[in-house]
Amino acid sequence: MSLRRIMVTAVRNLHPVTLSPSPRINILYGANGSGKTSVLEAVHLLGLARSFRSTRLNPVIQYEQAACTVFGEVQLSEGGTSNLGVSRERAGDFTIRIDGQNAKSAAQLAELLPLQLINPDSFRLLEGAPKIRRQFLDWGVFHVEPRFMPAWQRLQKALRQRNSWLRHGTLDPASQAAWDRELCLASAEIDEYRRNYIKALKPVFEQTLSELVELDGLTLSYYRGWDKDRELNEVLASSLLRDQQMGHTQAGPQRADLRLRLAANNAADILSRGQQKLVVCALRIAQGHLVSQARRGHCIYLVDDLPSELDDQHRRALCRLLEELRCQVFITCVDHELLREGWQTETPVALFHVEQGRITQTHDHRE
């Protein structure tokens, strides 16, 4: 899938604009602070109903405007189009529309418009808390395993019930046992989907990484959230007193993690910034390959400040891999000349100059 058209109104400093992007490579260039990243933010808002720059949406809404709106016409992989719209009012009201109908959740957007973001904060995938890596993992499972979301919802409900009981002791023993059983069943299902996904992801990630950078010995492993040699019901029983003292369930899929190690060390502790960026890119690109295999469609990639942290050789290698995905890519940079040699002649490349919130399409830089 790809965006055929996108209309942006009152997003940060951007002037109202309608863009008809290339189905492949789109480069947004201009000075720092011109609004390039705000274009990526608008696409992200359309696909996930949230910003990647702020946990609050009020800062996204242009000063003195009551609401921001993003509309997109999506070319579907199976043919035909779908119209998506997201509107956020400063007062807090949020509207998601899909083909003229109100949507119930942002998950419906995510299914229609799978997005991959690579930006300066992407280092957090390696350096940050396990929650960030779980989100990465579950994004991938969600897009390849249709049974994942119902199981995840059951898991969340069972966890809420158990944690409430741990804090307040409001469940009778029979109800407590029933919710523990439901928690264990949902956990086993989630764990199976995650393990299968990692099994498929690892060889694709390793191959992709080898085309970007030489990092012999880097390993990716999955920790499910409890001892691999014990059943979860046994772990829950043995940790009950501790769970009651803490007020929440300590073992289970909600504690899962992905571990990247190099020479027995946490990879984030010894890799340079450039190497970390390439590892994250390899993970994101590998996910895109799995989405394409499972759905016969493509992710849309948002790459903020692609040239940063990378020398010319690695910039070219990253551009080549993004190009080989045959998906739609939106890239920001200050100097588009740095990407001049990154693409094959036959690949459609659209250039957009961004200056003080105004966006102008310019000529293909290879012409």
From Swiss-Prot:
Q: Where does ATP bind?
A: G30, A31, N32, G33, S34, G35, K36, T37
Question: Does this entry carry the keyword Kinase?
Answer: no
Task: Supply the PROSITE patterns for this chain.
Answer: RECF_1, RECF_2
The superkingdom listed in its UniProt entry is: Bacteria
Under InterPro entries, the record lists: DNA-binding_RecF, DNA-binding_RecF_CS, P-loop_NTPase, RecF/RecN/SMC_N, RecF_2
Q: List, alphabetically, the Gene3D superfamilies matched.
A: P-loop containing nucleotide triphosphate hydrolases (3.40.50.300), RecF/RecN/SMC, N-terminal domain (1.20.1050.90)
Q: State one molecular function term (GO).
A: ATP binding
Report the family membership.
Answer: Belongs to the RecF family.
User: Which protein, by its recorded name, is this?
Assistant: DNA replication and repair protein RecF
Lineage, uppermost ranks: Bacteria, Pseudomonadati, Pseudomonadota, Gammaproteobacteria, Pseudomonadales
Q: Corresponding gene?
A: recF
